[in-house]
Every structure is written in C-alpha cells, then in structure tokens.
Amino acid sequence: MKKSLIFLVLLFSCTVIAQSDPKVAFQKTRYELAVSCYKKADFVKALDLFSIASKIKPENELGKESIKKVDTLKTMLRKSIMDKVIGSWKMNGNQPLWSVNATNTNDTDGIDELVEINQKQILFYEVDTKTKAKKLIKTEDIKYYNKEESDALFSAIILSDGTIWNCSLNEDSDILHVINIARQTENGVEKIKADNLERFYSKVN
C-alpha cells in the first residue's frame, strides 16, 4: 500500500512537470523576445512581452525578473508620456482633428473646452472664445490605474468618478487621444467593450 502511494505521488509529480515544461518554454521565448525589443528601444512591445512572461509562471526566476522589468518599463514610459503632455490642450471632440475639420463639427456655442496638465493634476476649463475668459470647471489628481502589478497598461488614469481612461499621443505628440476603457464601481472594475467614449485634444502652443 505504501509503495503504491509513493508510486502515485511520483507519477503525479512527473505529470505536473511534463505539463509545466511547455509553459516554461513559452515563457522563455516571451522573455527573450522582450529583451530583444528592449535592446531595440521598442519599450511598449517589450513591456507587453514581459507582462505575458510574468503571468505564465510568476513564481519562477523568469517570472520574478519579468515583473521587475514590467515595473521599470511602466515608470519609464509614464515619465516619457508625462513629459510630452504637460501643457494646455484644446478639446476637438470625439473625432480626430482632420475629421472634425472636414465635417465642420466644431463647437459653435462660443465655448472651448481646455485642459491644463502638470505633473500632478489635470485642470478642466471652459474658455469664452470671444473674451478668452477661463472658468475652472474641475480639478483631477493624476492617478495611474493599476489593476495588477503585471498589467502592461501604463498610460491609463482613473478619475474621481471611477472612470478609467487610456491616453495616447500621435507621432508628433500634438494630438492627445483619450478613451474610456473601464469604470470602477462598488462591485469592481467593469470593462467597456463597445461604444467607448472618446476625446481628442490638440496641443495649444
């Protein structure tokens, strides 16, 4: 009976190891590809790959090293995008600037919506297009959204109303695109998978 039990334990152990080997192999390829992307300065792709590697087997050495890289890259990429978004931005609507101009859907009520971004806060203003008078509507502290430590999402912020917005810039860093990807409620985070609210902002010189 004792020998049978030992055999079953060994058999189970061997089965588990055999099943985990493909995962470790896949994790290794993701990690190596992430390192390659990092060396090429493709930091966004590297972050995504390190994130995948960290989730496959978070307890092994590759998993632990990957999560460290995720944290480092998030910090680096957030600093990079923050350096570019500091300043004033005029809202163009829920379409790209070229589309707004082409269809002539600019706001005509004499009020522009403006946001000013600094290292810690986002200030929302209404600006009278005739008098240029600015009225502060609300202020939001910049708080990055981090559901999981291993998450590859680095440019999402959560506002005081629980809405979560992912932010991105165009190549020239003069158009800011924000999209509502989720909302935090008492029941947890609800992802928005369709009809996401979007906003486009152009840099004010």
Each PLM stretch: what is its role?
Residues 24, 94-101, 119-186:
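Contiguous, well-ordered beta-strand patches that form the walls/edges
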Residues 81, 95, 110-127, 205:
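Flexible low-complexity loop/turn motifs enriched in small/helix-breaking residues
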Residues 19-79:
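Alpha-helical protein-protein interaction scaffolds
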Residues 74-90:
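N-terminal helix-cap/turn-to-beta initiation motif at the start of protein domains
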Residues 91-92, 195:
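Acidic, glycine/proline-rich Ca2+-coordinating loop motifs
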